[in-house]
Regions:
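Acetyl-CoA-dependent GNAT
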Residues: 2-70, 81-83, 87, 135
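Short acidic/glycine-enriched loop/turn segments that link adjacent beta-strands
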Residues: 35, 58, 100, 121-126
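Glycine-centered flexibility sites
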Residues: 49, 73-77, 116
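Conserved glycine-rich acetyl-CoA-binding loop
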Residues: 65-82, 97-105, 109-110
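Conserved catalytic-core motifs of GNAT/GCN5-like acyltransferases
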Residues: 93-97, 108, 113-129
Length: 136
C-alpha cells in the first residue's frame, strides 16, 4: 500500500524502518521543506520503500527514492514512481549518479530524458539531470 505523507500527523500508524527511514527523519524534512512530500510503500505498518519529492509550483523534483534491500526487484520503486506521476501531473526533474544503472533504466522506462551532465558532482562521479515532461 502506498501512502502520501503531507504532514507529520499522517505518520501515526506507521512504524519506523531503522535501516531505511524513520518518522523523525520524515518529520524533520517536512518541517524544513514546505514543498516536501513523501510517498511511503508500507507493508504491515512497516516502511519498505519511499519516494521523497518537492512539489514546487509548476514542476516537481524527486529528491530521493529508496526501497529496502529485501524488497528490491519486486516493482516497488516502479509503483512509487507511477503514483507520483499520477499525483503531480506536471514536469518532473531529478538527478542521478551516472553509475546508478538500475535507477537510470527505471527513469527511462517512465519517459525521463537526460537533460545535462554535472561533471564530478558526486565526489568525482558525474550526475545526470533528467526530466519527464507532461504529455497533454
Amino acid at each position: 500500500m502506498i501512502i502520501l505523507i503531507n504532514k507529520p500527523s499522517d505518520l501515526k500508524n506507521i512504524n519506523d524502518n531503522q535501516e531505511l527511514l524513520t518518522k523523525s527523519k520524515i518529520t524533520e524534512e517536512l518541517q524544513v521543506n514546505p514543498f516536501g512530500k513523501y510517498l511511503l510503500e508500507v507493508e504491515n505498518n512497516q516502511i519498505i520503500g519511499y519516494l521523497y519529492y518537492s512539489d514546487i509550483y509548476d514542476r516537481a523534483e524527486i529528491n530521493q527514492i529508496e526501497v529496502a534491500i529485501s524488497n528490491r526487484n519486486c516493482g516497488k520503486a516502479s509503483s512509487l514512481l507511477e503514483k507520483m506521476i499520477k499525483l503531480v501531473d506536471k514536469n518532473i526533474t531529478l538527478e542521478v549518479k551516472k553509475t546508478n544503472t538500475p535507477a537510470i533504466h527505471l527513469y527511462h522506462k517512465y519517459n525521463f530524458e537526460d537533460q545535462a551532465i554535472r561533471k564530478g558532482y558526486y565526489q568525482g562521479i558525474d550526475g545526470i539531470l533528467m526530466e519527464r515532461k507532461v504529455r497533454k
